[in-house]
Amino acid sequence: MVQQINIIDAKDHVDEKVKIGAWLTNKRSSGKIAFLQLRDGSAFFQGVVVKSQVSEEVFELAKEVKQEASMWITGVIHEDSRSKFGYEIEVEDIVVVGESEEYPITPKEHGVDFLLDHRHLWLRSKRPWAIMNIRNEVIRGTYEFFNQEGFIKMDSPILTGSAPEGTTELFHTEYFDRDAYLSQSGQLYAEAGALAYGKVFTFGPTFRAEKSKTRRHLIEFWMIEPEMAFMHQEQSLEVQERYIAFLVQGVIDHCQYALDILGRDVETLKKYTKLPYPRISYDEAIELLKENDFDVDWGVDFGSPEETFLADHFDQPVFVLNYPKAIKPFYMKPHPTRDDVVICADLLAPEGYGEIIGGSERATDYNYLLDQIKQAGLNPDDYAWYLDLRKYGSVPHAGFGLGLERFLTWITAEDHVRETIPFPRLLNRIYP
């Protein structure tokens, strides 16, 4: 009996007759030979149908079968040094499983809106396939890293009665007889987890009702948010850079084929595994920007041009430390010798991708935190449980958040964050 295999396992079956379930992505043919571009979800490769070596029925089927038709392919695996994948199948038999008439995404250039309208089908194409495989590796690597580091995975609620970031950019819904919101962050709940279990991380969807159309913003995105008890900011920075380097190395080790499809330079990625990452203060960043003709004043948050310059200046991810208190959320710990900055850091990625991590040491003083909640215009009653964490055995603790899609945009060198999530939710798009 002929063994059924996945395309990705072709290397283990050279010169063997196998059976593969696949879809046709493209084809070309002459009078004597037909070339079928095939995919099965595990990889892409070529099927070669030689007229003199198959029945007339099989050769005619190879010429007539339509794009994205599904079929069983039987044939012999051979090495193919001309392709990135390295293998092909010499086809002996074809059985069509599912027809595909007038597939809308033809092998030509299509506009962004057209491809987003057909995202459910565009996911089948090579570039989205490669990105989603890298996404899967980053998720796998996240669990491996934090398990090795002794963290517990904790699930934070998606429906909340308060806003962790202290903003009004919330999706509102009714929760029986009161208001509720879709979560902007799991951080506050992760802090409770850290004081219970020592080290925790949350990983789940978050929602920001930001009316932004930039290439770096999604309405719905996924966040990894670790929190660590008995830990100060410098220790947290060390965890952060180890985590990033671990993820990048995992992509290099396990996603070479996907990186080849994307044309991503592995040597560039290797630079990002070298630790430690540079650290500069916000004050130093302002001076560096001014020296290079940026019109910036102390107290402003950095935009994309400033973040791009700073990271590219070091040609590495760079930590910018201790931002002004006025532009950061209420829960950050004040600086011990200055009342105008907080103990925090953003990690900026090079190549124009900007902030991928935001983190801080958390405020531990009950009265200070209560005052900050009031100054942010928030209702202290909504945060009574959070304030309790400072009443009963408060300890130094720190944490950070990494936006999965922003990280992936950098690693895959994509132009827009929408390409790194299967079904992006944008300001004017909630379909499909």
UniProtKB/Swiss-Prot annotation:
InterPro entries: Aa-tRNA-synt_II, aa-tRNA-synth_II, aa-tRNA-synth_II/BPL/LPL, Asn-tRNA-ligase, Asp/Asn-tRNA-synth_IIb, NA-bd_OB-fold, NA-bd_OB_tRNA
GO cellular component: cytoplasm
Top-level taxon of the source organism: Bacteria
GO biological process: asparaginyl-tRNA aminoacylation
Cell location: Cytoplasm
UniProt keyword annotations, A-Z: Aminoacyl-tRNA synthetase, ATP-binding, Cytoplasm, Ligase, Nucleotide-binding, Protein biosynthesis
SUPFAM superfamilies: Class II aaRS and biotin synthetases (SSF55681), Nucleic acid-binding proteins (SSF50249)
Enzyme class: ligase
Pfam families the record matches: tRNA-synt_2, tRNA_anti-codon
Manganese among keywords: no
Enzyme Commission number, as recorded: 6.1.1.22
GO molecular function, one term: catalytic activity, acting on a protein
Reaction(s) catalysed (UniProt annotation): tRNA(Asn) + L-asparagine + ATP = L-asparaginyl-tRNA(Asn) + AMP + diphosphate + H(+)
Tagged with keyword DNA repair: no
Family: Belongs to the class-II aminoacyl-tRNA synthetase family.
Complexes and interactors: Homodimer.
UniProt cross-references to PANTHER family, sorted A to Z: ASPARAGINE--TRNA LIGASE, MITOCHONDRIAL-RELATED (PTHR22594:SF34), ASPARTYL/LYSYL-TRNA SYNTHETASE (PTHR22594)
Protein name according to UniProt: Asparagine--tRNA ligase 2
